[in-house]
A protein has these predicted regions:
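Inter-helical turn/loop segments and adjacent helix faces that build the functional surface
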Residues: 222-234
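Core alpha/beta nucleotide-donor-binding catalytic domains of modification enzymes
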Residues: 1-217
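Internal, active-site/partner-interface "lid" segment
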Residues: 205-212, 233-243
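Short, surface-exposed loop/turn segments at secondary-structure junctions
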Residues: 202-206, 229-232, 301
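Single-residue recognition of alpha-helix capping/boundary positions
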Residues: 187, 231, 303-306
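AMP-forming adenylation/ATP pyrophosphatase catalytic core
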Residues: 2-37, 53-54, 58, 62, ...
């Protein structure tokens, strides 16, 4: 398959990203909603993948069932797109889909978080089922800018301000990659138009009841028009700089963990309560954020002040707090136990 825009930044980013990934031979899963970003990623991957390096491309579509017939139309669109992609490329392209229960997504405070968790849980299961070592999602530099701004508003620490990582572990043996993280939505739109490829628009992206949408539709345009036209690039670049700095924090957090962590009990992390008193609160706060990231526990919903409060109080006898995602921190006589309830 030869795209018309061979020198497109989209193709170059995907090509370089693939070259940086290990263990891709067994196949790559790519999440495709039908929107511009994911359609662009799937098409670029199909153009760049070679049989000798990647055996198959698995397109994974999640039907959230939140918009009824529109969700079903998205699913049908992606299926047809994949059929055309299969015809135009030598790469084996498989289609996988799941329909979620909308009632389960409406439980608790955030539909967005429930939907995201459901998606990534399914991606994890699918990776194990298909024996794929990588799951790719179509996050862009625009998403990065929104994420950094959202986390600034929530008072995130340094690791939070590093934004979306280009690569991270999804589950043991499976990586989560964002090949388009340094491409803008405008570049992806141009790439698809050059290749006469259409995509679907999700009307829920215009609903400002979701914080990310409100930032994208209201706050970022205000900052761009009134203060700094290049604000998205600046925020995305800031995330890159902080990501480099956060690696130093991670090393420090690991050293702290070696002195605090005791043998875990199933899914519970156990800390030496007496050893906690040897560390200042800022180091404990840093360690906790690193621990939550490592364990894949919800981290974005916890504000900077809450991290400080927990670090200050967690060594106190009888301390207990319940956090987002069902995570509990409980202080006992000699230990502090953290984990799902």
């Amino acid at each position: 398959m030869k795209p018309r825009s061979a020198n497109s930044p989209v193709l170059l980013e995907v090509k370089n990203f693939l070259a940086s990934c290990k263990n891709v031979k067994s196949g790559i899963i790519v999440g495709v909603s039908g929107g511009v970003d994911s359609i662009g990623l799937a098409h670029a991957l199909a153009c760049q993948i070679k049989k000798e390096t990647v055996s198959k491309l698995i397109v994974a579509h999640v039907n959230h069932a939140s918009r009824g017939a529109e969700n079903d139309a998205d699913q049908a669109f992606v299926r047809l797109f994949i059929e055309k992609l299969q015809e135009a490329t030598d790469t084996l392209v498989e289609f996988k889909t799941i329909k979620l229960n909308p009632d389960e997504l409406n439980v608790g405070a955030s539909w967005e978080k429930n939907a995201r968790l459901a998606r990534y849980n399914w991606f994890s299961d699918l990776a194990l089922e298909c024996k794929a070592n990588w799951v790719f999602t179509a996050h862009t530099s625009n998403d990065q800018a929104e994420t950094v701004l959202m986390r600034i508003l929530r008072g995130s620490g340094v690791q939070g301000l590093a934004g979306i990582k280009p690569k991270r572990s999804l589950i043991r043996g499976v990586g989560l990659g964002r090949p388009l993280l340094f491409c803008s939505k405008e570049q992806i739109c141009a790439y698809l138009r050059d290749n006469n490829i259409v995509w679907r628009e999700d009307p829920s992206n215009q609903q400002t009841r979701f914080l990310r949408n409100k930032i994208r539709l209201d706050l970022l345009p205000l900052l761009k028009n009134e203060y700094q036209p290049a604000i998205e690039g600046i925020l995305s670049g800031l995330a890159g700089h902080i990501h480099a700095y956060s690696s130093l924090e991670k090393r420090l957090a690991r050293k702290i963990g070696l002195k605090l962590e005791k043998p875990r009990v199933l899914d519970q992390v156990v800390l030496d309560r007496l050893a906690l008193s040897k560390f200042p609160n800022w180091k404990l706060s840093l360690f906790l954020r690193s621990l939550f990231a490592r364990e894949l526990w919800p981290i974005d919903a916890i504000h900077h002040k809450q991290w400080k409060k927990i670090a200050h109080n967690m060594a106190a006898d009888g301390f207990e707090v319940h956090l987002a995602g069902g995570i509990r921190i409980q202080s006992n006589r000699y230990t502090v136990v953290l984990g799902p309830t």
